[in-house]
């Protein structure tokens, strides 16, 4: 049986509040994390992702207290990232109530963090996060770090392979070209990624309409679609989205 596709709201957290930027800048505050998480659970979200956007850029501590408060009220899986540098950081977040931990920039600097995290907590708890941007001159999707501000020499597809080989049980991949545009997911990127690895891939960046989700699931083998602003501002209602997907033949939990 095909695994049901997942709809995953993302909550970017700054100073304990939910915010959403366009292309990682121009932040706009949209609410309380616990209330937002409860509302998403009630609406039928399959999982939630939290990113502490202050952690990587300004060396802040991770969002332990937010995770603890949310996990007491919400029972769908929580994936948390931002500023995670050690397996001790991972352990503290898991103890606070996170089900999965995602690591982005630090995995590029220290790939053993993925290996060690998977050994200690299991692959199911470790998510490799990638910010990817098309590089026309090189003909590759290039990996960026530090909140999408610094290019690396890495090819995103090859890096995805390595993350999985090191023990990541899932990938969370953001298209920087599409992020914040509301013009649809980067079908080419996710088609390549979903074919390249044998773990679930969560697509992030570009959702602007219900049809964008339909296109993603119909044109790629992607497992989950992440979005933020279209959900935060009520532009797309999750129950309506799921009904449309189901009507279009997408395997989804209603």
UniProtKB/Swiss-Prot annotation:
It is an enzyme of class 4 (lyase). Coiled coil: none annotated. InterPro entries: Aldolase_TIM, His_biosynth, HisF, IGPS_HisA/HisF, RibuloseP-bd_barrel. Pathway: Amino-acid biosynthesis; L-histidine biosynthesis; L-histidine from 5-phospho-alpha-D-ribose 1-diphosphate: step 5/9. It catalyses: 5-[(5-phospho-1-deoxy-D-ribulos-1-ylimino)methylamino]-1-(5-phospho-beta-D-ribosyl)imidazole-4-carboxamide + L-glutamine = D-erythro-1-(imidazol-4-yl)glycerol 3-phosphate + 5-amino-1-(5-phospho-beta-D-ribosyl)imidazole-4-carboxamide + L-glutamate + H(+). It holds the Pfam family His_biosynth. Keywords: Amino-acid biosynthesis, Cytoplasm, Histidine biosynthesis, Lyase. The active site is at residues 12, 131. GO terms for cellular component: cytoplasm. IGPS catalyzes the conversion of PRFAR and glutamine to IGP, AICAR and glutamate. The HisF subunit catalyzes the cyclization activity that produces IGP and AICAR from PRFAR using the ammonia provided by the HisH subunit. Belongs to the HisA/HisF family. This is Imidazole glycerol phosphate synthase subunit HisF. It comes from Leuconostoc mesenteroides subsp. mesenteroides (strain ATCC 8293 / DSM 20343 / BCRC 11652 / CCM 1803 / JCM 6124 / NCDO 523 / NBRC 100496 / NCIMB 8023 / NCTC 12954 / NRRL B-1118 / 37Y). The gene is hisF.
């Amino acid at each position: 049986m095909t695994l049901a596709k997942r709809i995953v709201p993302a909550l970017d957290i700054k100073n304990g509040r939910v915010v959403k930027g366009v292309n990682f800048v121009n932040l706009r505050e949209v609410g309380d994390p616990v209330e937002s998480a409860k509302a998403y659970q009630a609406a039928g979200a399959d999982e939630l992702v939290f990113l502490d956007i202050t952690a990587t850029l300004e060396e802040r501590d991770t969002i332990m207290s937010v995770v603890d408060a949310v996990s007491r009220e919400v029972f769908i899986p929580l994936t948390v990232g931002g500023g995670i540098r050690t397996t001790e950081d991972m352990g503290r977040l898991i103890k606070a109530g996170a089900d999965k931990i995602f690591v982005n920039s630090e995995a590029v600097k220290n790939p053993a963090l993925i290996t060690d995290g998977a050994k200690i907590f299991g692959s199911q708890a470790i998510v490799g996060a990638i910010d990817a941007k098309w590089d026309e001159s090189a003909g590759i999707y290039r990996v960026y770090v530090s909140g999408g501000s610094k290019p690396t020499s890495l090819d995103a597809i090859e890096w995805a392979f390595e993350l999985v080989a090191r023990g990541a049980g899932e990938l969370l991949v953001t298209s920087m070209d599409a992020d914040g545009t509301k013009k649809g997911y980067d079908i080419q990127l996710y088609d390549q990624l979903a074919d390249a690895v044998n773990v679930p891939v969560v697509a992030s960046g570009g959702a602007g309409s219900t049809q964008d989700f339909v296109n993603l699931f119909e044109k790629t083998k992607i497992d989950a679609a992440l979005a933020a602003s279209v959900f935060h501002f009520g532009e797309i209602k999750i129950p309506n989205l799921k009904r449309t997907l189901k009507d279009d033949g997408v395997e989804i939990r209603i």
